[in-house]
Amino acid sequence: MDKFQRYLDLNRAWQDNFLYPLLFQEYIYTIAHDHALTRSIRSILFENVGYDLKPSSIIVKRLIIRMYQQNPLIILDTDSIPNRFFAYNKNFYSQILSEAFAVIVEIPFSLQLVFSLERKEIDKFRNLQSIHSIFSFLEDKLVHLDXIPVSNVLIPYHIHLEILAQTLRYWVKEASSLHLLRWFLYEYCNWKSLILPKTDIWFFSKRNPRFFXILYNFHICEYESIFFYLRNQSSHLRSTSSGFFLQRIYFFXKXXNLVKVFIHXXFQDILEFXXXAFMHYVRYQGKSIIYSNNTTILMNKWKYYFIHLYQYHYYMWSQPGRIDRNQLCKQPLDFLGYLSSVPITSSLVRTQMVENAFLIDNAMKKLETRVPIIPMIESLSKAKFCNALGNPISKPTWADSSDSDIIDKFLRICKNLSRYHSGSSKKKTLYRVKYILRLSCLKTLARKHKTTGRVFLKQLGSEVFEEFLRREEVVLSLIFSRNDLTPGSLYRGRIWYLDITSINDLVNLK
């Protein structure tokens, strides 16, 4: 274990650059007083001309003083009237204080993200766009593998928040900051039981989403660091990580060579893995997806590792049923709005040899990516474009807009969904979604003009709605060089347009 000691040491630079909230003293209350300011504070901190983005608490404090001076109406003397500040609504002020605490704690991680993007020479404003024939963790030749085990691991979620707070002790060495952190947690949770009820932690995550995301990401970062360390020791090839951000609130960038490991003594026997593992790891919506071409015995060892990781390292009793194992040829993988599978299709070939004829059954594998119809109908129904059965309905909240604005809104949603799901191998579900949006747009316009959809379509003409049925053009990203996208490669694979910044329009519309 001596030669791996460098992986077991903490990265001291993170501790030195950590911005302790108590350094700002009364200025944290200034941020908390203006609740709307917390949404744009990071843009204010990082977009001021004249400041170089270095992890310096002096620069951040000067910026906070500058904001404090721009709002003269904020007069808060925390030394003279501490009780009066909390006398009106204790829960409300503790909530906005926790959000201000989270904003300041996010600063070093945002700086770390900017530095990692600069090292990779990627434009930070376009880092959420990517194009690939299939998802990056499915880019290997899956069709040539005999068995493709996939483990869908449910990450422990309903855990005691004290465990989340203790995770910060490796990063924050200041006792006062940890005491302040625990004070926020005491406002919402009951500390008598080791495992919190689902309602308590759900309430905390809803009231303080930013604060909870920081604690939860600390928890997951430590969990993943152990897994990456063991995976590197079991493979001859060093794993390469990629920054794939589904939401801006997940501010962790998985950069290469950024491994921080804290191994329990019970895991030393796990290091006996010596086979060259072919493994990929993806985290998405509280689940970790692991797939490999390993044998069943080796995958069972990884399952044994995960169960013991939860029990001995996080003090969380984990049921074996929380880890699902399946093969892509038998059960599809639900990931990022796609159902990916590798079905085995048979084709009969008739061969004639002299007087005898033979029928040869050839089994072929092909990676298929389908769009699930039920979640799509549920999303459209939630946004009031159709009912629960998928029948299109009008959008009453848009009836006050102009005709061109209504058509543009529906077209924007239709194009975003069409581009995002253009990588599907079967377009039947995508065509049905376009049909629902087209009729919903027609019903909305008819509702505005107080007529029926059929009469309005005759008056307006069907040419207006041809955009809904027009085939999407291939969109190329500017991140990749021209050498990476040769004309031959464009025709061999399906091109996916994955624009994370705009695919959530359907969910966010009211």
Swiss-Prot record:
A GO molecular function held by the record: RNA binding
Keywords assigned: Chloroplast, mRNA processing, Plastid, RNA-binding, tRNA processing
Location in the cell: Plastid, Chloroplast
Subcellular location, principal: plastid
Family: Belongs to the intron maturase 2 family. MatK subfamily.
Record's signal peptide: none
Any Gene Ontology CC annotation: chloroplast
Protein name (database record): Maturase K
Described purpose of this protein according to its UniProt entry: Usually encoded in the trnK tRNA gene intron. Probably assists in splicing its own and other chloroplast group II introns.
One matching Pfam family: MatK_N
